[in-house]
Design a protein with these regions (language model features):
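N-terminal strand-loop element at the rim of the active site
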Residues: 6-74, 83, 100, 149, ...
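Acidic anion/phosphate-binding donor-loop and adjacent secondary structure
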Residues: 124-126, 154-155, 162-163, 170-187, ...
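Glycosyltransferase donor-sugar binding loop
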Residues: 171, 198, 221-234, 248
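Conserved donor-binding/catalytic core segment of Leloir-type glycosyltransferases
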Residues: 187-205, 211-217, 222-223
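Nucleotide-activated donor-binding/catalytic signature segment of Leloir-type glycosyltransferases, i.e.
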Residues: 233-256
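Acidic donor-binding loop of glycosyltransferase active sites
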Residues: 257-273, 283-286
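Conserved acidic donor-binding segment of nucleotide-sugar-dependent glycosyltransferases
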Residues: 302, 306-314, 322-328
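A short, well-ordered alpha-helix in the C-terminal region of glycosyltransferases
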Residues: 329-344, 353
Length: 363
C-alpha cells in the first residue's frame, strides 16, 4: 500500500511524523509530503520518505505578513505540481488544506482521506465554513479524532456517516526520548508542585479562565508556556501570585524539561477536537485536568483526567486546589495516563485502523 500523508502548511508535524512512522512500521510504503517547519527541528521517525515540496521559496519571518503572502502565492502551483506527483500513491491522506475555496478544485484524482483535526474552523473567515463543508464532501473518507467530532460532522456538516471514521490521536512520545535541557535557574529552584499549561497561547484555550481560577491556590506554581498568538497583557495584569509566563516557542530538550518537571497538566480549553499537547502529556504519563470539550471526555473515561466545565473558573479552582493538595490522586491519574498511552492511544493499533480504512477505499 503506497500512502502519501500530506500536510502542506506543516501545521502538525509531530502528528504527521508519528503517523507516517507508524504506518511504515505496519507495512505501508509511506511518503510524508509537507513543507519545512519554520520553528525548529522536528524529530523524524523511521521507515518513510520525507518530501518537503511545498512553499520552498517562502520569505519573511514565521507568522509574518510577507511569509503568509509568499506561501499563498506558491500554493496553487505547488498543489498543481503535487496533484501530478500523487499519481504514485494508492491513497492520499490529507492532514490540512489551508485555502479551502481553492483546494477543492486542486485535489488529486486518487482515493482521498482527510483527518479533520478541527471539524470546522474556530475563527472562520467569510465563506470559509461553506468551503470546508464542500471540501469534506469531496473526500472518500474523513477521519475524526473522537465520537464528539463524528457527531458534529454528521449533524452540523451533513457528512454521510458511512464515510466518517473515528480514530483517536495517538500519543506524541518524541520528547520522551530527548535529553531534557536544564530549566532556567528561576524555574529550576521551584520546589512546590508545578501545574503546566503548555502550547500556543490562543483565545480559545481559556487562559483567562485559568489565570482567574488560580486565585487562592497556595503552595504550588502555574507555568503558562508557549508562543503567544494573542494579546497577553490582560493575563499579566490579572495573574495572582504563583503564575509564571514563558512566552516563546519551546521545543526539543527545553520542552521535555517542562513536561518532566510538571506535576499536573491542565488544558482549560473552551473548544477543541484533538490536542497535540494532550497527546504529549499522555506520553509523559502526566495526570491531567481537562475541560469537558471535544475528545477530552473520552480521554477522561480512561481514568487519566479529571473534567471541569469549560469557562467555569470556580469549578476549575476547586479541581486545581483538590489535585494540588492530593498527591495520591495525582499518582492514580498518572498511572491511568501511562496505561492509556500504552493502550488505546498507542500508534500500533491506530496505524492498523488507518490501513484497514485505506484498504476499503482501494478495494
Amino acid at each position: 500500500m503506497r500512502v502519501h500523508v500530506v500536510d502542506p502548511p506543516a501545521y502538525t508535524p509531530p502528528y504527521d511524523h508519528a503517523l507516517s512512522s507508524a504506518l511504515a512500521a505496519a507495512g505501508a510504503d509511506v511518503t510524508l509530503v509537507t513543507s519545512a517547519f519554520p520553528y525548529g527541528e522536528v524529530p523524524r521517525g523511521d521507515g518513510y520518505r520525507l518530501d518537503e515540496r511545498f512553499y520552498r521559496r517562502s520569505a519573511g519571518a514565521p507568522g509574518g505578513t510577507l511569509r503568509r503572502l509568499t506561501r499563498l502565492a506558491a500554493h496553487v502551483p505547488d498543489m498543481l505540481a503535487y496533484r501530478r506527483a500523487a499519481a504514485a500513491a494508492d491513497v492520499v491522506h490529507l492532514q490540512w488544506l489551508t485555502v479551502g475555496q481553492v483546494d477543492e478544485r486542486l485535489l488529486p484524482r486518487r482515493p482521498l482521506v482527510l483527518t479533520a483535526h478541527d471539524v470546522l474552523p474556530r475563527e472562520p473567515r467569510p465563506g470559509q465554513v461553506a468551503a470546508q463543508a464542500r471540501l469534506l464532501g469531496r473526500m472518500d473518507a474523513v477521519v475524526v479524532l473522537s465520537e464528539h467530532g463524528r457527531g458534529r460532522l454528521v449533524g452540523e456538516v451533513g457528512i454521510d456517516p458511512g464515510r466518517v471514521e473515528v480514530i483517536p490521536h495517538g500519543v506524541l512520545d518524541h520528547l520522551t526520548h530527548v535529553e531534557p535541557d536544564p530549566l532556567p535557574a528561576e524555574l529550576a529552584a521551584v520546589e512546590v508542585p508545578v501545574v503546566l499549561c503548555f502550547g500556543l497561547m490562543r483565545p480559545y484555550k481559556g487562559l483567562d479562565v485559568l489565570v482567574q481560577a488560580w486565585e487562592g491556590i497556595g503552595d504550588a506554581e502555574l507555568w503558562v508556556v508557549g508562543r503567544p498568538r494573542m494579546d497577553t497583557a490582560a493575563l499579566h495584569a490579572t495573574a495572582p501570585p504563583g503564575v509564571r509566563f514563558v512566552e516563546r516557542f519551546v521545543d526539543g530538550g527545553e520542552a521535555a524539561a517542562f513536561f518532566r518537571r510538571a506535576d499536573l497538566a491542565v488544558l482549560p480549553y473552551r473548544e477543541i477536537e484533538g490536542s497535540g499537547v494532550l497527546a504529549t502529556a499522555l506520553a509523559f504519563g502526566l495526570p491531567l485536568l481537562l475541560t469537558d470539550v471535544g475528545s477530552f471526555p473520552e480521554v477522561a473515561a480512561t481514568g487519566a483526567a479529571e473534567l471541569v466545565p469549560p469557562g467555569d473558573p470556580v469549578a476549575l479552582n476547586g479541581a486545581l486546589a483538590g489535585l494540588v493538595g492530593d498527591p495520591a490522586r495525582r499518582r492514580a491519574l498518572a498511572a491511568a495516563s501511562a496505561a492509556a498511552a500504552a493502550g488505546p492511544y498507542a500508534w500500533g493499533p491506530i496505524a492498523e485502523r488507518h490501513l484497514a480504512l485505506y484498504a476499503r477505499l482501494v478495494g
